[in-house]
């Protein structure tokens, strides 16, 4: 006979590795890891895929299911998000609005914003409550703004706005008949003095920005900055504190015309009390303290700040040469660069989709999956996608992992993933023909393949039973008996067989080379370990040892072993030959000696205590129970070893009697919970960047408990 069939001392046997298993009915099957995405149904082995997110294409390959009407697309390098290149871009793995760096629109932590200089500002409209763009005005200056536009506040008593060829013109308000006139040369005082021997016209002049009083040098003079009538010595006129008087008779007749007056022998000047005044005997223009007109030794002028200037005796708005405001023949204008534009209606923003303007506010027209909120632009996501401050995140469960930003499927041998897809690793006992996996059968051996399936060539005393489930059977006489599935000589003593008082039980791989034992982890994940358990029952007391090893490539990359430890649990099920569902850790068939011993001898004893059995969770792949939740247990300390980088310090094993809701027999199970502790400078066993060859090994850990007996 050749591999994989062997002939042992008792029967024909089929050798398998960890990818195949034999059930209690002796049927060959594929060994599957619960929760790894592979399921076995009536049609054969298949991948259990979520139909909403995963699908099989026409070639039978597994791919991500994408909505054809959505923004996602498939490329040769993976899944991509289709973007409008004119408005959206991806920068450093983040989706954002594409902005022209030369334009006034910018982005910040709160969203899109406008870059403004000191002449513009953003303010909240007290009526609508919306933020609006406006011109920045000095609150202490005369320039104001309302719903009609920018305005210049003036003193209505001294200033007025006249209509000019290109719009309004600021001018000094002159009272009709007030003694002041204006012409292209400026403001002047008009006065007619007509005494019998004196006549004067236009005594006021305005030259080079200075108001002066032109006097007749023969009749008027200025003494100590005071205007006075020039009296000729011996001319018949005298002057004293009371005024001018004629010193000769008869008194001449003196008359005066406005703005000059003559009363009781005194000549006076009638002035408007709102625009002129006499101070210290001098005629002056009356200036309002905040009226915008100032007086100096050079004369009367307009007071201006940095926003106004006087050029060629003309008041102009002072604009920044590097700013957007300019002045010309048509008045003040605002220069704008794209996307801003200036028209008769005001400053407008040129925009195109997806930008919109609603109720005088700039907005962004968006479509699903984007939405706008108080915090800015966000992306609506559906499971398994979610959005956070760090970006869009893909949530994935068991069977997936993310390496270097790429979603990958986790596989366990014999399935591996390469750049070409999934690959099934198989031993020479298998072959692939026409893309189908089959057994590699030696035609000269006792196993043959026909159109009906796999067949075994047999000779007496072997035969195949009839019925709905045919099986290979052995014909034997009454001199033999079958005990625990093994052929044995019938008891010739006539008294019948009895359960041995001493028996041994062992399961697993004593060489610790087969990583096929299922271990449950605290974080709802699972791992594969190699383990060997040996039990010895004598007089109702069971003594056992358990040894476990594994390496990082068999574990999910979740958590921090340096701070939390390497924690896992396995379950030993002595009654698994009668109750396969109780075999939570998926041990291969156990060996019991002697052949007549019952496996019940090795189950924990439920008698003699009350409520000491811990009930495990009913989830097939998640039955880890923390130490604090165990009803009662025994704790054993041990010293593990392993890779130097891990710096393993100590280990603990808790042993507890347990039951699983999925088991069908009454016998208890043995719950073994492990905790491996590291020094603080050790390497995290779960670090995705750590070597997958990091490993640990426990010593054979002894434990004892009371066995099942009555």
UniProtKB/Swiss-Prot annotation:
Membrane-traversing stretches: none
Record keyword Ribosomal protein present: no
Induction: Expressed in the late phase of the viral replicative cycle.
Biological process (GO), any one: symbiont entry into host cell
Keyword Hydrolase among UniProt keywords: no
SUPFAM superfamilies: Fibre shaft of virus attachment proteins
Membership in a protein family: Belongs to the adenoviridae fiber family.
Protein name: Fiber protein 1
Species: Fowl adenovirus A serotype 1 (strain CELO / Phelps)
